[in-house]
A protein has these predicted regions:
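Hydrophobic alpha-helical transmembrane segments
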Residues: 1-34, 58, 62, 74, ...
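Secretory targeting signals
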Residues: 1-25, 55-127
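Terminal transmembrane helical anchor/hairpin motif
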Residues: 2-5, 85-93, 128-212, 216-220
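Helix-loop-helix units of permease transmembrane domains in multi-pass membrane transporters
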Residues: 29-64
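Cytoplasmic membrane-interface regions of multi-pass membrane proteins
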Residues: 36-39, 117-120, 218
Length: 259
């Protein structure tokens, strides 16, 4: 069944991995855009606090990504009900699997990953740094998927998987086809712990952003090359120009007191 709760969870899990590439250019760029357009000097003169500014920038980006994911979700739901679809591969429409997929995949992944990308691009003012992080976290997730194939590593991989795929696999790896077609996703135990771990990391990152961010800060830069030292030599020694001042005749006679 292609629209079973199990199939939909896998579909939205893959969607979360693809949408993450939008984060640097939507969520991360919200503060960077102010510096790039040199509008920050004007914006920072307004009477808002640092917290208000960061929350507005972060959640405005989250809202835009939410709209994109919401429209994709509507497209998926409508696609299963278009004329010509094979009824043998479909079950009756049920809103709960969509809601579960949003709660366990889309929202947590968006918040914690968005917070990290937001912080990286904000402090480096470099969108490329955000994309590098996206690639790194996808590599990490791929490593954990491979690591979790061994039975003794399943629990560790389930807890550390940033997208929650291995946490779902922890409970559903040995499901039969009938169970995959009929049962809802088990939101319990290890799955909840995984989501809480990464939401906590995202929250901690945002708190760090708030603590470190300053309206007058300079961008953080990273370089593995040692910069050549430059010697500055003062070259204007003896360059003082002599000026002939007009001569003044001083008079201390008594008649000056009557002028």
């Amino acid at each position: 069944i292609v629209n079973s709760p199990f199939a939909l969870s896998g579909l939205f899990a893959g969607l979360s991995s693809l949408v993450i590439f939008l984060y640097p250019s939507i969520i991360g760029v919200s503060v960077y855009r102010d510096f790039k357009s040199e509008m920050h000097t004007i914006l920072y003169s307004y009477p808002f606090t640092k917290l208000e500014y960061l929350l507005a920038k972060f959640f405005s980006g989250i809202f835009i990504v939410h709209i994109i994911v919401f429209l994709i979700g509507i497209g998926i739901a409508l696609g299963f009900n278009l004329p010509g679809t094979n009824p043998d591969l479909l079950t009756d429409f049920d809103i709960k699997p969509y809601f579960d997929a949003y709660i366990i995949y889309v929202l947590p992944n968006m918040l914690f990953t968005g917070a990290i990308v937001f912080g990286i691009v904000t402090f480096t003012r470099n969108i490329s740094a955000g994309f590098i992080f996206v690639i790194v976290i996808l590599i990490l997730q791929g490593f954990l998927v491979s690591f979790g194939q061994e039975q003794e590593n399943r629990l560790v991989a389930a807890l550390l998987d940033p997208f929650g795929d291995m946490a779902l696999d922890y409970y559903t790896r040995y499901w039969t086809v009938a169970e995959q077609n009929e049962l809802y996703i088990p939101i319990k135990g290890v799955f909840i712990y995984n989501r809480l771990i990464w939401l906590t990391i995202g929250f901690a990152v945002f708190i760090s952003i708030y603590k470190l961010f300053a309206f007058s800060q300079n961008a953080f830069t990273f370089s593995f090359r040692k910069k050549d030292s430059v010697r500055f030599t003062k070259s204007n020694f003896g360059g003082i120009t002599k000026i002939d001042l007009p001569k003044i005749n001083l008079s201390f006679s008594a008649k000056t007191k009557f002028n």
